[in-house]
Amino acid sequence: MIRIVLAAFAALSLATPAWAQEKAAVLYKAEGCGCCDGHADHLRANGYKVRVVELADLEPIKKKHGVPAAQAGCHTIEVGGYVVEGHVPAKIIDRLLAEKPPIRGISLPGMPEGSPGMGGAKVEPFTVEELGSGKVFAVD
């Protein structure tokens, strides 16, 4: 009986919970972009395990994920099967991962002042759009 309990415990300790897998992110950024590092730090502070990949050209990543030029940010994040463009706050990414909507991803177009990684004071609400359709996903 003890062997069965120990075996079950060992098996459970090796399993990775779904939420932990979803919190792993890859952030693709242009070489030398400091605001992208700031956004990665924001995500880490909110429980994400972020791997940063510096590229000379982000266009192939954006093309791979079908990111429209009007929604392109200075960096592209792959997380939980979704694409996140730009300085989207972690709490909105959390919502995306929790709700699992049938969309490709989300974008915070432009580089709004006060958004995570950008610095400065927030001067207006952030409107986060569904990638492609442009429909509002969240306002923060």
Predicted regions and their residues:
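N-terminal secretory signal peptides that target proteins for export/translocation
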Residues: 1-2
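Stable alpha-helical elements in mature extracytoplasmic
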Residues: 32, 39, 54-57, 89-93
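Local sequence-structure signature of Cys/Sec-based thiol-disulfide redox active-site neighborhoods
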Residues: 21-46
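Conserved helix-turn-beta segment immediately C-terminal to the redox Cys motif
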Residues: 40-60
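Thiol/selenol-based redox catalytic cores and closely related redox-interacting motifs
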Residues: 64-140
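Short active-site oxyanion
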Residues: 24-25, 47-50, 80-83
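Bacterial N-terminal signal peptides
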Residues: 5-15
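Sec/Tat signal peptide C-region and signal peptidase I cleavage site
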Residues: 16-20
